[in-house]
Every structure is written in C-alpha cells, then in structure tokens.
Amino acid sequence: WAREMKETFGAKNPRSWLMRFHTQTAGASLTAQQPEINVVRVALQALAGVLGGTQSLHTNSLDEALALPSAEAVTIALRTQQIIAEESGVTNTIDPLGGSFFVEAETNRIEAEAYDYFRRIEDLGGMLPAIEKGFFQSEISDAAYRYQREIDENKRRIIGVNAYNDEKEVKVPILKMDPEGYEKQKARLDEIRKTRDNEKVTKSLERLKNACEGTENTMPFILDSVREYATLGEIVNVMKDVFGEYEEPTWI
C-alpha cells in the first residue's frame, strides 16, 4: 500500500501511506459439524487479524454455519475480542511479529503475488474491463472450487468434517425468528404506505430512474426516495428495471 501510494500515485502526506483496514473472521471456515469448536477457529483468526495490525474487527459467531447467530453466540464472539484485547497482551506492542523471518518471507511472497494480479488486470485493460470479463468472479469461484476439492480428497483436513469426526450430534441453540415480529413489521409498512405522500414517492422514484438511465450519481436520488418513505423494494425495482439483474458472466 505504502509503495503504491508513494510511487504510483505520488502521495506526499505520510499519513496517506498508512494502510487502514478492517478484518472479519472467515465465515466460510465455520462448520455445521461440531459447531462449538468454531469458537476456536474464530479466536485464532481474530488473533491473526490483531497481530496483523487491523484497526477494526468483526468476529463471526459459532452458529453461523447453521443460521443467523443467536444472542448467546454473538456474546461469545464479542467476548473473544475482549479477551484478545484485554487479557492476551498482544495489543501492548505495535508489531509483535515484526522481524520474524517467516512473516517477512510471507509478506514478500504476498506482495509479489499482488503485483502479479496488478499486471494481469492491466493486461485485461484495467478494472472495469476485468469486471466485465468476469475475471474476479472467476478467480473467486476457482479458489472456492480448489478449496472444496482439497477437503473432498482429504488433502486439507477440517476437524469434524474429514478428521476427528464425532458421531454424537452436538446441538447448539438456534435463533428462531418470532412470527409476531413479521406481522408487526408488515403492519408498520402498510401504515407507512397509507400515510406517506405517494405522489412525492412516485416523483422521487422517477427522478431515480432518470439518474439510473443517465450518468449521474444515483446515491442522492436514492436518499431522496428514502426521505419520501419509498420502500427498499420499490427503490430496487426501479434500479432493476434499468440495470436488470445480475447474471454470472461466462469466462473462457
């Protein structure tokens, strides 16, 4: 980041050389089998993020491979962060792993691979052509496919999935949405539709459609529609009429 800011973009202010980033633990690594051990996975990933200098952190909950997280699971995820912050001592040093041969070697390897990606993107004509050609979607799907193949072929061991399996089913509390909450929200929405100025809503959505059909920034028009109490569905439908729906690109 610092090298690109200085050498490619000519940034003069040293503060702009600082890379600020957020970390979220890997939801894709959570397993429905033996879900309680997801706590360990999340703790290790969170610790890695803190050791790497993350400015903010989201820890996934242990039950997210099964459903939306329960209040109990969310609390454990929060306590994981608090233990790392206040009990582990890793936050007492700015860069605890600085100077480690392994970390420095990995840093150099990742940097080299990043520059290889930069080159490949430029060869495709830049970011927009790369998006249009499905390059990024292809890279992500290929990585996901390789990851799953490694698990299926036992080349990558996942505890509870293809290693140290436990026939005993462990049940964790699953969040169940209250049907009454749905009915209350539906009633609120019906009331808003009755009491809002529908003429203003229609006009705001028309302005949004015009912006979508042109080259203007659509965000101000989205916010105007929200202020007139247009629903999310109404706003999305306007944009869908203009832009269509996402279709996975074919990458050859």
Model-predicted regions and their roles:
Residues 2-12, 40-53, 76-88:
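Structured alpha-helical segments in the cores of large, soluble enzyme domains
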